[in-house]
């Protein structure tokens, strides 16, 4: 191979690296924002000469725009002359939609008990403690949707309310038919006797701890902690007290 050919191959091999280096050079204000903890999630162009950036901090999205000399950044929403928020769809695309997909996948991988048909169009995750009266009330309110095949509840057990919550949760999880056991327990308002293991097996303890960590990561500190996807695919949260009728219709994707 001639010297010129070797040089040409070397230059060609470096081109992707050089391109990546050039693309990674951010305007100074964006770099300063990154040092403050903001993370760049995406960029967009509204006009040929008007570019915006989407950044995220602690789960919250915002848009950033640069001055013409690129020495200053303006952080906040962009509103047009009619009051329309032009930032919202871009924040949704680059921050909240990916975040919803990620959290939904984590919910799917958690240890849950299915209550409802496989082909139910609406899936609703519910973190519950066996001693939570509001969880029981929500379970009863959800029956019309579940029984009609419109909703599948995915009930995620946690142990936070009483010292033996873990024993009751483990009894439900370890039973031959967790769905029936939970159904009998909730429908009897906790009067059904549970075969509580003592001690709780290590794998069940690990599952309960993982469920609690996920619940905390989602920002929940009360049960029931209810999660579902809006028609737009955004993760929605409902905590604590059982929802009113209108909110129930929203969670369940419609009327029963």
Regions found by a protein language model. Give the residues of each.
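A short, surface-exposed interaction/processing loop segment used at functional sites
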Residues: 70-97
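Bacterial N-terminal signal peptides that target proteins for export
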Residues: 1-8
């Amino acid at each position: 191979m001639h010297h010129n050919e070797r040089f040409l191959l070397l230059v060609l091999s470096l081109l992707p690296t050089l391109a990546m280096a050039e693309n990674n050079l951010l305007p100074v204000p964006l770099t300063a924002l990154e040092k403050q903890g903001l993370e760049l999630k995406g960029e967009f162009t509204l006009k040929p000469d008007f570019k915006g950036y989407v950044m995220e901090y602690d789960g919250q999205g915002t848009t950033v725009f640069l001055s013409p000399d690129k020495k200053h950044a303006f952080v906040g929403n962009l509103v047009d002359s009619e009051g329309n928020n032009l930032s919202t769809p871009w924040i949704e695309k680059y921050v909240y939609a990916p975040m919803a997909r990620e959290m939904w996948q984590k919910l799917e991988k958690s240890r849950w008990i299915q209550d409802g048909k496989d082909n139910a169009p609406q899936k609703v995750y519910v973190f519950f403690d066996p001693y939570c009266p509001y969880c029981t009330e929500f379970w009863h309110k959800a029956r019309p949707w579940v029984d009609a095949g419109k909703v599948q509840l995915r009930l995620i057990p946690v142990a936070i309310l009483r010292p033996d919550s873990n024993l009751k949760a483990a009894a439900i999880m370890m039973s031959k038919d967790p769905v029936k056991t939970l159904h009998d327990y909730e429908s009897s308002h906790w009067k059904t006797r549970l075969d509580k293991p003592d001690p709780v097996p290590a794998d069940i303890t690990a599952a309960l701890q993982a469920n609690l960590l996920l619940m905390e990561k989602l920002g929940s500190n009360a049960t029931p902690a209810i999660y579902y996807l809006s028609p737009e695919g955004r993760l929605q949260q409902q905590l604590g007290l059982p929802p009113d009728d209108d909110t129930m219709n929203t969670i369940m994707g419609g009327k029963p």
